[in-house]
Curated annotation (Swiss-Prot):
EC number: 1.3.1.-
Protein name per Swiss-Prot or TrEMBL: Putative 12-oxophytodienoate reductase 2
Source species of the chain: Oryza sativa subsp. japonica
CDD domains: OYE_like_FMN (cd02933)
Top-level enzyme category: oxidoreductase
Binding-site positions, substrate: H178, G179, A180, H181
Residues at which FMN binds: P31, L32, T33, A64, Q106, R230, G301, G322, R323
Keywords attached to this entry: Fatty acid biosynthesis, Fatty acid metabolism, Flavoprotein, FMN, Lipid biosynthesis, Lipid metabolism, NADP, Oxidoreductase, Oxylipin biosynthesis
InterPro entries in the cross-refs: Aldolase_TIM, OxRdtase_FMN_N, Oye-like
Length: 376
C-alpha cells in the first residue's frame, strides 16, 4: 500500500526554533511513565523505545524520573540521583541523538503519591500536608504522608538541582521540571493539598514559593536555555486541585518570565467537552500562552486535526502527544501521510515487559509489508 503525503499544509510538520534549538516539526513525545527501569535503573530496552520515536529535529521528553530515594511512588521508574543511573542513561541518550533528535529529561518527586513500601526504611512519604489521598476506584491506597518541616525544603530543592546537573552529565539537552498532576510541587501549589501555616502555605505566592525555588535552583545550575516545566493548573488529580487555577497558572508564568530565555512552558488542557457528539479540547490555556515569553507546549488529548489547528492559530508552538506516540513510533510520518494509527493497548502501559506494549508497536512500513504479503 502506498501512502501519498496529505495535500493540505500541515502546521504540525513545519520547522520551529525553540531558543537556540532547531526543530524540524512540532510533534513532541510527552513524558510517559512506563515502569520498565528495573530497580530504578534505566535499561537497554529504553534505547530501542526512545530511538524508535526519534526523528531528525524532533523533540522527545523522557519519562518522569525520580530525583531521590524519597521521590519514588511507582514500581521500576527510573532515577537520576546515583552514578549508576547517570551512566545507564548515557547510551539511551546517545541512541536518540544518533537519530538527530533532541532529548529532555523530566525530573520528578511524587510527594504523597506513594506508599511506605517505596520509601527508604519504610518511612512515610513526604508532602506539603499530612492529609492522605482519598482511595480511588482502583483500590489503590496511598500511605498517610508526613508534612515536610520548613527546614527540610531546601534539601528537596537541592535534590532537583542535582538531578538537573546529573541529567546534563548523562547527555540530555535539558530538563523538564515536573510541576503537574498532583505530585510534590503541585501539592504545594494547590490550595486543596496545601494547608501549611509557614511561608510555604496560605496565599498564592507562598504556595508557589517551593516551585519557584526549584525553578531558580535548576536555572542557576544548568541555564534557563536548558529548562522547561510542566504545569497543570486545572488538573484535579490525586486530590490536588486549586480554587483559582487561572490565577495559579498566571502567577507561575510570571515567575518563569523572570528568567530570560526560560526555554518552554508545557501545560495540560483543562479537559474535554462534547460538541456535536465529538470530543473537543476546551482550549483553556490561552491566557497563559499570551503571557509566557518562551515556547509554549500544549498537551491533553490532541489528535492530528486539533494539533494542526492550535499550531496554525498560534495557540501553541508545539503539541505533546502521549498515548498516540506510545502506540505509533512513527507518529510524525503518519501525520504527514494522514495514515491510520495503531490503537494503544492500555493494559500494557505499566507492565514490566521490555518488548510487549513497549517496542513492538509496528511502523507504517511494517503494516504495509504485511498487507501485501501473499502466502502459498
Amino acid at each position: 500500500m502506498v501512502h501519498a503525503p496529505a495535500k493540505e499544509a500541515i502546521p504540525l510538520l513545519t520547522p520551529y526554533k525553540m531558543g537556540q534549538l532547531e526543530l524540524s516539526h512540532r510533534v513532541v513525545l510527552a513524558p510517559l511513565t512506563r515502569c520498565r527501569s528495573y530497580g530504578h535503573v534505566p535499561q537497554p530496552h529504553a534505547a530501542v523505545y526512545y530511538s524508535q520515536r526519534a526523528t531528525n529535529g524532533g523533540l522527545l521528553i523522557a519519562e518522569a524520573t525520580v530525583i531521590s530515594p524519597t521521590a519514588q511512588g511507582y514500581p521500576d521508574t527510573p532515577g537520576i540521583y546515583t552514578q549508576q543511573q547517570i551512566e545507564a542513561w548515557k547510551p539511551i541518550v546517545d541512541a536518540v541523538h544518533r537519530k538527530g533528535a533532541l532529548f529532555f529529561l523530566q525530573i520528578w518527586h511524587v510527594g504523597r503519591v506513594s506508599t511506605t513500601d517505596f520509601q527508604p526504611n519504610g518511612q512515610a512519604p513526604i508532602s506539603s500536608t499530612d492529609k492522605q489521598i482519598t482511595p480511588d476506584d482502583s483500590g489503590m491506597v496511598y500511605s498517610k504522608p508526613r508534612r515536610l518541616r520548613t527546614d527540610e525544603i531546601p534539601q528537596i530543592v537541592d535534590d532537583f538541582r542535582r538531578a538537573a546537573r546529573n541529567a546534563i552529565e548523562s547527555g540530555f539537552d535539558g530538563v523538564e521540571i515536573h510541576g503537574a498532576h498532583g505530585y510534590l510541587l503541585d501539592q504545594f501549589m494547590k490550595d486543596s493539598a496545601n494547608d501549611r501555616t509557614d511561608e510555604y502555605g496560605g496565599n498564592l505566592e507562598n504556595r508557589c514559593r517551593f516551585a519557584v525555588e526549584v525553578i531558580d535552583a535548576v536555572v542557576a545550575e544548568v541555564g534557563a536555555h536548558r529548562v522547561g516545566i510542566r504545569l497543570s493548573p486545572f488538573d484535579n488529580y490525586m486530590d490536588c486541585f486549586d480554587s483559582n487555577p487561572v490565577a495559579l497558572g498566571s502567577y507561575m508564568v510570571q515567575q518563569l518570565n523572570k528568567h530570560p530565555g526560560f526555554l518552554y512552558c508545557h501545560m495540560v488542557e483543562p479537559g474535554m467537552a462534547i460538541v456535536e457528539g465529538r470530543r473537543k479540547i476546551t482550549h483553556g490555556l490561552l491566557p497563559f500562552r499570551k503571557q509566557f515569553n518562551g515556547t509554549f507546549i500544549a498537551a491533553g488529548g490532541y489528535d492530528r486535526e486539533e494539533g494542526n489547528k492550535v499550531v496554525a492559530d498560534g495557540y501553541a508552538d508545539l503539541v505533546a502527544y502521549g498515548r498516540l506516540f506510545l502506540a505509533n513510533p512513527d507518529l510524525p510520518r503518519r501525520f504527514e501521510l494522514d495514515a491510520p494509527l495503531n490503537r494503544y493497548d492500555r493494559s500494557t502501559f505499566y507492565t514490566q515487559d521490555p518488548v510487549v506494549g513497549y517496542t513492538d508497536y509496528p511502523f507504517l512500513e511494517e503494516i504495509d509489508e504485511e498487507s501485501t504479503t501473499t502466502y502459498a
